[in-house]
Each structure stands twice: as structure tokens, then as C-alpha cells.
Swiss-Prot record:
Gene name of the encoded protein: HBAA
GO biological process: hydrogen peroxide catabolic process
InterPro entries, alphabetized: Globin, Globin-like_sf, Globin/Proto, Hemoglobin_a-typ, Hemoglobin_oxygen_transport, Hemoglobin_pi
Family: Belongs to the globin family.
Protein name in UniProt: Hemoglobin subunit alpha-A
Superkingdom of this protein's organism: Eukaryota
Tissue expression summary: Red blood cells.
Length: 141
């Protein structure tokens, strides 16, 4: 459960991300595909090479979903319900991949905002990403 302080921390770090979200999304996917190559299996139709247009486009979607969750931080499940349905019923993505993606996003944020990612903010962002992961995997049951 996200505390009031967690919500403030998450909103604050996303404010710092600002207009860099699309780049961070692509960087997150690139990192995930490099560190966890098994995740590429869900993207057989993608050019998963560094900097590809498809990676950039999907990275933009990933960050847009995270921003949607931040904007509805008190109802993440409602905000991401359709996305949860898509991943559970149509795409059938292994639920473990959401946690891998979240960890890669944390690394990217840390690279670009090291001074802002204090231990408290890091913990809050991790809790938020875990909450998003939980929502996205809830409909697998």
C-alpha cells in the first residue's frame, strides 16, 4: 500500500522525468532486452535492436501507462484495467516480466536522476512499480 509520502515521492520523480519519458521508456526496454533476453520472445515482430523505431514507440506506450497510473495513483487498478486485460487475455505476457521491466525502469531513473533518487524516493518508486505490476497481473488468476 502506498503511503501519502510514497505518493508524493512518486509524483515528484515523475515530474522530474517530464518530457524525457519517451526516451526513458525506450531505454528501459532496451535495457530489459539486453539484461533479460528471454523477454524478447514476446516481441517477435519487433526490431529489438538498440534505438529501433519499434522500441521507441513501445517505450512511449510503457511510460504513458506509468504516467496514467501516477495520474490515478489512488485507483491504479481502474486506470490500468484495459491494459491488464490486454496483457492477460490477448498478449499472455509472463507476469514475471512486469517486475523485470520495473527494475529496469528504476535503473534508468537512477542513471538520469541520481541525486533525486534518494533511498526514500527509490523505495517509493519501487513500491509504485510493484503496485503497477500487481495490477497488470491481477487478471491472470
Amino acid at each position: 500500500v502506498l503511503s501519502a509520502a510514497d505518493k508524493t515521492n512518486v509524483k515528484g520523480i515523475f515530474a522530474k522525468i517530464g518530457g524525457h519519458g519517451d526516451d526513458y521508456g525506450a531505454e528501459t526496454l532496451d535495457r530489459m532486452f539486453t539484461v533479460y533476453p528471454q523477454t524478447k520472445t514476446y516481441f517477435p515482430h519487433f526490431d529489438v535492436s538498440h534505438g529501433s523505431a519499434q522500441i521507441k514507440a513501445h517505450g512511449k506506450k510503457v511510460v504513458a501507462a506509468l504516467v496514467e497510473a501516477v495520474n490515478h495513483i489512488d485507483d491504479i487498478a481502474g486506470a490500468l484495467s484495459k491494459l491488464s486485460d490486454l496483457h492477460a487475455h490477448k498478449l499472455r505476457v509472463d507476469p514475471a516480466n512486469f517486475k523485470l521491466l520495473g527494475q529496469c525502469f528504476l535503473v534508468v531513473v537512477g542513471i538520469h536522476h541520481a541525486s533525486a533518487l534518494t533511498p526514500e524516493v527509490h523505495a517509493s518508486l519501487d513500491k509504485f512499480l510493484c503496485a503497477v505490476s500487481t495490477v497488470l497481473t491481477a487478471k491472470y488468476r
